[in-house]
Amino acid sequence: MGRSVSARKRHDQSEVRRMRGRMARSAARTCARRYLAAVTSGDRESSLPLLRSLVKRLDTAARKGVFARKAVARQKSRMCRLYNGVFSSPEVVRV
């Protein structure tokens, strides 16, 4: 940690930012885990709201700079493809 007041302030700010990013990352991973569990169990009714929740969390994390924008787009695409593959229905889900 720095000696000057500004260095201490920057350190404190980076700690707060790191914790916020950690919480957002953890929330997104938890959502993904719940969604994957619902899809693998074949529960169609609960997996669609979980997918929407996951997409919302990922977009928020990307907007805040926790995840890279294209990495989030790739993850969302894979999750939607998984849903459409498992529950192959005439309606295609795009989020």
Swiss-Prot record:
Nucleus is among the record's keywords: no
SUPFAM superfamilies: Ribosomal protein S20
GO terms for biological process, alphabetical: translation
Cross-referenced InterPro entries: Ribosomal_bS20 (IPR002583), Ribosomal_bS20_sf (IPR036510)
Biased composition (Basic residues): 1-11
Keywords assigned by UniProt, alphabetized: Ribonucleoprotein, Ribosomal protein, RNA-binding, rRNA-binding
Molecular function as annotated in GO: rRNA binding; structural constituent of ribosome
GO cellular component: ribonucleoprotein complex; ribosome
Cystine crosslinks: none
Pfam families in UniProt: Ribosomal_S20p
Gene3D superfamilies (alphabetical): Ribosomal protein S20
Domain of life: Bacteria
Ranges for region Disordered: 1-25
Family in the record: Belongs to the bacterial ribosomal protein bS20 family.
Described function: Binds directly to 16S ribosomal RNA.
Name of the protein described by the UniProt record: Small ribosomal subunit protein bS20
Organism: Treponema pallidum subsp. pallidum (strain SS14)
Gene name of the record: rpsT
